[in-house]
Regions:
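Detector for small/aliphatic-rich hydrophobic stretches
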Residues: 1-55, 67, 74-79, 83-90
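Conserved inter-motif catalytic segment of the P-loop NTP-binding fold
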Residues: 52, 60-63, 67-72, 76-169
Length: 171
């Protein structure tokens, strides 16, 4: 039966704008992807990062997510510079810019087209995005960013949802 109970009221069914199609009839045009420079990650992502995509990388603490992201950021920055695209912006809410630079030195990831910002306020992060027009934005980690317009602390469900939604909109 159409509709579901939400807040004690039944939602009304709305006529679809276009009919549902058999999957084989859907245009198979594949969005172009950009290599991350890390072969195994490209394989997992189906060829690389699709422009406008939002990817959430999750894992246990200490498994190397931040190091992997920094490596990807440096390789993407190098590629972006050579192809005339904007810089890569790496926003860290977990470490200072100096700590990220230290790791970048250790893994050979110092690239002039790689910008680092250590911020935890969403408005400031969005200001960095607007000012730098990055070809790739990496946020490490979304749960450390908070919005002044949303109640609760960074990492809470409402904050993570609002921050993620804002970042998706700028993607």
């Amino acid at each position: 039966q159409a509709g579901e109970v939400t807040g004690g009221q039944r939602a009304a069914a709305t006529p679809p704008r276009r009919p549902a199609l058999p999957i084989g009839d859907v245009d198979g045009e594949r969005a172009s992807s950009r290599s991350t420079g890390v072969g195994e990650l490209d394989r997992v992502l189906g060829g690389g990062i699709v422009p406008g995509a939002v990817i959430l990388l999750a894992g246990e603490p200490g498994v190397g997510k931040s190091t992997l992201l920094l490596d990807v950021a440096a390789k993407a920055a190098r590629t972006a510079a050579s192809s005339g695209r904007g810089p890569v912006l790496y926003v860290t809410g977990e470490e200072s810019a100096a700590q990220v630079r230290g790791r970048a030195e250790r893994i050979g990831a110092l690239e002039p087209n790689l910008l680092i910002a250590d911020e935890t306020e969403l408005g400031i992060v969005l200001g960095h995005v607007e000012a730098s027009a990055p070809s790739l934005l990496i946020v490490d980690s979304v749960q450390t960013i908070s919005s002044a317009q949303v109640e609760g602390g960074a990492g809470g469900v409402a904050q993570v949802r609002a921050v993620a939604a804002s970042l998706i909109r700028v993607a």
